[in-house]
């Protein structure tokens, strides 16, 4: 027989994954920086600025790293979680999830090329088609998000809203980049 439990709500900001979405240059990175400054101090707030994202550049005092591809991102996350004593941060942002998705797609396309010795036309054609490429992208992203969630760090995901309307799980209309929508619709339980 199942035991009835009472749900407890946490008021610790690190216990949730936060999603900040908005138009370019509206202040998403600034919002994360200010939340970090108030909650734990800027010295304990880290921005993972993906690829060519530059929102962190106008935020004085905000620590950041700038992985240029999926392998650099993965290696950094692995090191940060494996050796937390070297990373005194409490809050971490991935800025932006749009670039993270693009990096994951590039990684999957390279893996396809290595395995099949020929390029595929799109992510949909990777690994024989039928959504296998998208599934591989979702796995890569979900694994990294879960790794961070299971660690000591609070996680903020920052993204751009654009291109296509989508309704989130609470019925709120948002607009997201098509590739980001495809990936995060599969991992919505992770995003919170």
Q: Residue ranges of each PLM-predicted region?
A:
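Phosphate-binding/switch region of NTP-binding enzymes
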Residues: 6, 147, 154-192
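Amphipathic alpha-helical transducer elements in NTP-driven molecular machines
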Residues: 67-74, 91, 127, 131-142, ...
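Conserved P-loop
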Residues: 2-94, 98-106
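Short, basic, glycine/proline-bearing loop/turn elements
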Residues: 15-21, 59-65, 124-133, 171-176
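Catalytic-core regions built around general acid/base machinery
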Residues: 140-151
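Short, conserved acidic/polar surface loops in the N-terminal third of protein domains
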Residues: 102-107, 142, 167-169
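Loop/turn-to-beta-strand initiation segments
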Residues: 87-91, 150-157
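A solvent-exposed, charged loop/short amphipathic helix patch at secondary-structure junctions
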Residues: 105-136
């Amino acid at each position: 027989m199942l035991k009835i439990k009472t749900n407890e709500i946490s008021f610790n900001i690190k216990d949730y994954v936060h999603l900040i979405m908005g138009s370019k240059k509206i202040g998403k990175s600034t919002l994360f920086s200010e939340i970090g400054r108030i909650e734990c101090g800027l010295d304990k707030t880290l921005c993972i600025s993906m690829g060519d994202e530059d929102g962190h550049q106008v935020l004085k005092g905000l620590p950041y790293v700038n992985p240029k591809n999926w392998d650099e991102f993965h290696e950094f996350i692995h090191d940060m979680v494996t050796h937390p004593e070297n990373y005194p941060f409490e809050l971490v942002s991935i800025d932006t999830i749009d670039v993270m998705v693009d990096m994951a797609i590039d990684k999957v396309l390279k893996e396809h090329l290595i395995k099949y010795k020929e390029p595929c036309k799109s992510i949909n054609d990777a690994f024989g088609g039928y959504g296998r490429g998208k599934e591989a992208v979702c796995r890569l992203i979900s694994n990294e998000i879960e790794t961070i969630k299971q660690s000591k760090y609070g996680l903020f995901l920052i993204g751009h809203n654009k291109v296509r309307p989508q309704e989130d799980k609470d019925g709120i209309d948002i607009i997201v980049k098509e590739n980001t929508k495809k990936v995060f619709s599969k991992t919505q339980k992770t995003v919170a």
